[in-house]
Amino acid sequence: MSDDLRRKIALSQFERAKNVLDATFQEAYEDDENDGDALGSLPSFNGQSNRNRKYTGKTGSTTDRISSKEKSSLPTWSDFFDNKELVSLPDRDLDVNTYYTLPTSLLSNTTSIPIFIFHHGAGSSGLSFANLAKELNTKLEGRCGCFAFDARGHAETKFKKADAPICFDRDSFIKDFVSLLNYWFKSKISQEPLQKVSVILIGHSLGGSICTFAYPKLSTELQKKILGITMLDIVEEAAIMALNKVEHFLQNTPNVFESINDAVDWHVQHALSRLRSSAEIAIPALFAPLKSGKVVRITNLKTFSPFWDTWFTDLSHSFVGLPVSKLLILAGNENLDKELIVGQMQGKYQLVVFQDSGHFIQEDSPIKTAITLIDFWKRNDSRNVVIKTNWGQHKTVQNT
């Protein structure tokens, strides 16, 4: 092969590579400009790979800082929910901070109203689901209900007796959740026509475990209203292994920031929140102000460490065996454990993977999560299917 021919081939290959790189960087630039979660196809989303922003790694210094105007106008709970209520649960010695939006309109051609009830994971809060709740309400045009709350030891939920022994094992969280569900059902949900209510429990991480194990403890009346249970980014085997790394994570996670905006910036910098619009409502709920003007993290996960080994035990087996419809949404390439693999092969639950989301699926991909939940509700609720028949409407033509 002549040198001239080799040179032409090399130049041609270089030009093709340059075009690919240019297109890739342009796509990444447009993605960052949009700063949202692009839609993929159901039931599995295999869109663009994770987008990594460039950060300096220093608190408060990032190429994605919010402006002074934005800092003075962070969103509040009322931008996402219609109501905020402090619910007293004397049997649990708790005053639980709750957020909810009730159905505002009904469909004439359906007999089902979906009620989405959310349970957050450890170290989070009910406002982790704020963007998701808003998307659900928007897409269903007010024809749904959304309930979220702060679990014990989190955000604005308080113990009635500050000096009482505090337990953070799974069973305690479950009893809280069951008590709160009973309150919601009697005071809010049952006000809707009962034949129309289809309740879907959605739990992120630890919340998924709590939803799974709470179901058998619900009253028979309430169990009949549970259409399905959804777990967000939780696999028993992986979760138990991850607990061994929590100490290292906590050592590298600041508990005090100069301001709430610095806290938001830090979580976005470190990709703990990949969608700023979600971070701006979810992160402030995790901090309380100090007299110095700084903010401190409300939940100290180190105090939970004696109870970690109770959180995920037997989760996969119990989830697969639930007698209701089940949905598991995972982020990235999370591997299934044996129980989930067998259950998936047997068609025991629906599996959806968001390749471009971080661990906080409801925050990083609220649009796709909303679409997936709506699809899950529609495909599993037989009351949404109206079968019309012409049986008996046609006269029989007899031969003459």
Swiss-Prot record:
Record-annotated AB hydrolase-1 domain positions: 114-365
A family per Pfam: Abhydrolase_1
An annotated Gene Ontology molecular function: protein C-terminal methylesterase activity
Region (Disordered): 32-70
Reaction catalysed by this enzyme: [phosphatase 2A protein]-C-terminal L-leucine methyl ester + H2O = [phosphatase 2A protein]-C-terminal L-leucine + methanol + H(+)
Enzyme superclass (EC): hydrolase
Domain of life: Eukaryota
Protein name: Protein phosphatase methylesterase 1
Species of the source: Saccharomyces cerevisiae (strain ATCC 204508 / S288c) (Baker's yeast)
Gene: PPE1
